[in-house]
Amino acid sequence: MSVTADGRRMLRIEAKNAETPIESKPRWIRTTAKVGPEYRDIKNRVKGAGLHTVCQEAGCPNINECWEDREATFLIGGDTCSRRCDFCQIKSGRPSPLDMDEPRRVAENVREMGLRYATITGVTRDDLDDEGAWLYAEVVKKIHELNPNTGVENLTPDFSNRPELLKVVFDSQPEVFAHNLETVPRIFKRIRPAFKYDRSLEVIQAAHDYGLVTKSNLILGMGEKKEEVRAAIKDLADAGTDILTITQYLRPSSMHHPIERWVKPEEFMEHSDAAYELGIKAVMSGPLVRSSYRAGRLYAQAKQARGEAIPENLKHLEETLDSTTSQEASTLLERYGASEDTPVTASRR
């Protein structure tokens, strides 16, 4: 019997994944930390108030850049997800009871950090009658109430595509409603067994029909083929997706899905071009791009492309439109030059 480091018995899929060693990264999977005054200010505020963000706790490679833009991400609903995805490092199992005071605390954290844009994400809560819809909506409302000049992005589960639950979330009026598709139909059930490809598209379509700015994410390197990525992008565009992020899968541990391929920056650029051609309004594509990376900038870009004015209280987000993005594929090519084929091999560490 295989067990985890904390003594838990491994799931069958985890034991199978663990047979493949952790992979060695190619040269373009690198970060360069540049620390500016906004980052230092937020870091001092977080440390002084004992705050917690996904940015720090997940060791996000883009924390310096996002905090310099005064953006951060918060995980709500607890630390245990009622579903398991083969790429995700959040533990799965029976979640703890809901913390009804969490919306207030998150909103106060946003105020304490002086954020211009906040992304709210969280675990799936199939154990609750409303699957956590109240919580996702209430956090948005509280942030807007205490922080009228802060944009809010709500990155949610699918709420089983129940219209009455989606409406609760939509009515909270986040600047962006996000639901991540993550991968292509052929391998979807293997990677996200508790989700459904078509259902995720229907959730995005519902948000689009409601009138919200919509967003999704694709993770590459889990076994998909290049042409399948293009087809998934088209599906997202047809569902009314305004913003798309595309990223390289990085394996959290040996118990997670092995990396099938390292996707070159050149291919990320091709997918970005395809997304724009298919009508998606704002795209960020690169190996270390994450779904909340430069989120305020992407919101502002999407609003402009939709022909809509950015609200006066969020005009400051326009300042980010011309800033450089260190993790976009085009920037990586300028930094490292053309890529060579990099087969997936075991790490020497």
Curated annotation (Swiss-Prot):
It catalyses: [[Fe-S] cluster scaffold protein carrying a second [4Fe-4S](2+) cluster] + N(6)-octanoyl-L-lysyl-[protein] + 2 oxidized [2Fe-2S]-[ferredoxin] + 2 S-adenosyl-L-methionine + 4 H(+) = [[Fe-S] cluster scaffold protein] + N(6)-[(R)-dihydrolipoyl]-L-lysyl-[protein] + 4 Fe(3+) + 2 hydrogen sulfide + 2 5'-deoxyadenosine + 2 L-methionine + 2 reduced [2Fe-2S]-[ferredoxin]. Coiled coil: none annotated. One of its GO terms (cellular component) is cytoplasm. PROSITE patterns: RADICAL_SAM. Binds 2 [4Fe-4S] clusters per subunit. One cluster is coordinated with 3 cysteines and an exchangeable S-adenosyl-L-methionine. Its main location: cytoplasm. Its EC number is 2.8.1.8. GO terms for molecular function: 4 iron, 4 sulfur cluster binding; lipoate synthase activity; metal ion binding. It is found in: Cytoplasm. Keywords: 4Fe-4S, Cytoplasm, Iron, Iron-sulfur, Metal-binding, S-adenosyl-L-methionine, Transferase. Pathway: Protein modification; protein lipoylation via endogenous pathway; protein N(6)-(lipoyl)lysine from octanoyl-[acyl-carrier-protein]: step 2/2. [4Fe-4S] cluster 2 binds at residues 81, 85, 88. This is Lipoyl synthase. It comes from Corynebacterium jeikeium (strain K411). The gene is lipA.
